[in-house]
Design a protein with these regions (language model features):
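C-terminal motif of bacterial Sec signal peptides marking the signal peptidase cleavage site
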Residues: 14-16
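Conserved HGGG/HGGXW glycine-rich cap/lid loop of the alpha/beta-hydrolase fold
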Residues: 36-89
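Active-site loop/oxyanion-hole signature of alpha/beta-hydrolase fold enzymes
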Residues: 76-119, 123
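Conserved hydrolase catalytic core segment
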Residues: 114-156
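Flexible "cap/lid" loop of the alpha/beta hydrolase fold
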Residues: 142-176
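Conserved alpha/beta-hydrolase catalytic His-Asp/Glu region
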Residues: 153-159, 175-232
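Conserved loop-alpha-helix segment in the C-terminal half of the alpha/beta-hydrolase fold
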Residues: 238, 242-277
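Catalytic histidine-centered segment of alpha/beta-hydrolase-like enzymes
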Residues: 277-286
Length: 299
């Protein structure tokens, strides 16, 4: 169970759950695009990169990275409605990740982007994989930051049926909806999400400012989603970054083997372990993430 919460980082309040004011005017996208599920702002110039945050996260979890990248790349920072203080819109009910992936695909098409790179952290990684597998013609490169393609199998016993996973997801959703303010599991997991103390209040604020039903439904969707059968449809060069969860009861070698097995359906994917980092690699090891992203952009 502890393992599950960690990986769900973005699926948790984790993915950078920070509640932020509207972006400055110079960050606002000048591209006409309307959606009741996501919004996008742009920064910088150069090859296009779409950055997708995770559960309960604001796009500002990418701010430090964006500061370093905007001189070389044009960044498209996605915000999923319902998280970190934003009204849920169409995300008030039902699935969140799959519809968000479709909306990002529509954004790419309607704004005329030419197969941009897509980078997703935690739940954002799930969204990015959905987009790359279901619309491979739209994605030029793909980076998944600390997210397996089948979250449910990471915290259920080996051999569990899809129905058993769904029952677990139902239970977790009910728990999120019933939790008293400030006592939810996400808040309890924040210390294991980043080593940078100054970033933890951001994650707490994002979690507390998120729409409860949107969070619960998004988390449920992540648990029951298994993208392993779809990985072979991804044609873009792909990099997967992962960390060993703190206090993990699983030996490192076993965990590494599990991650590689999970991505066996994407044989061209480069699976990279990031040392000395918790779930928010963009906070704990930004230089390493940037180096891996630059390498991916050269592929």
């Amino acid at each position: 169970m502890k393992r599950f919460f960690f990986v769900a980082g973005a699926a948790l309040t984790l993915a950078g759950c920070s509640k932020s004011p509207a972006p400055p005017a110079d960050q606002a996208s000048d591209r006409p695009f309307g959606s009741d599920r996501i919004s996008v702002v742009t920064r910088g110039s150069g090859p296009d990169i779409v950055l997708v945050p995770g559960l309960d996260s604001h796009r500002d979890v990418w701010d430090g990275l964006a500061d370093s990248l905007e001189g070389r790349y044009r960044l498209h920072l996605v915000q999923v409605n319902g998280f970190a203080g934003l009204a849920p819109g169409a995300n008030a009910n039902g699935p969140v990740s799959a519809p968000a992936a479709e909306e990002i695909g529509r954004y790419i098409t309607e704004t005329g982007l030419n197969r941009p790179a897509v980078v997703g952290h935690s739940m954002g990684g799930t969204i990015a994989m959905m987009l790359a597998a279901r619309h491979p013609e739209l994605v030029g490169r793909l980076m998944v930051v600390d997210m397996p393609p089948a979250l449910g199998v990471m915290f259920t016993p080996p051999g569990s049926t899809a129905e058993a996973v769904r029952q677990m997801a139902d239970s977790m959703r009910a728990g999120i909806l019933a939790a008293a303010p400030g006592t939810g599991m996400f808040e309890q997991m924040v210390p294991t999400m980043t080593k940078v103390d100054s970033m933890r209040p951001m994650l707490l604020e994002g979690s507390r400012g998120s729409h409860r039903a949107t969070t619960a439904n998004a988390f449920h969707e992540l648990i029951v989603t298994d993208l392993r059968p779809e990985l072979s449809r991804i044609t873009a060069p792909m990099t997967v970054l992962y960390v060993l969860p703190p206090n993990s009861p699983i030996p490192l070698a076993q965990y590494e083997s599990a991650m590689r097995a999970a991505y066996a359906g994407a044989p061209s994917a480069q699976i990279v372990k990031i040392e000395d980092s918790y779930h928010f690699i963009q906070f704990d090891q930004p230089g390493r993430l940037i180096a891996e992203l630059d390498a991916l952009m050269r592929r």
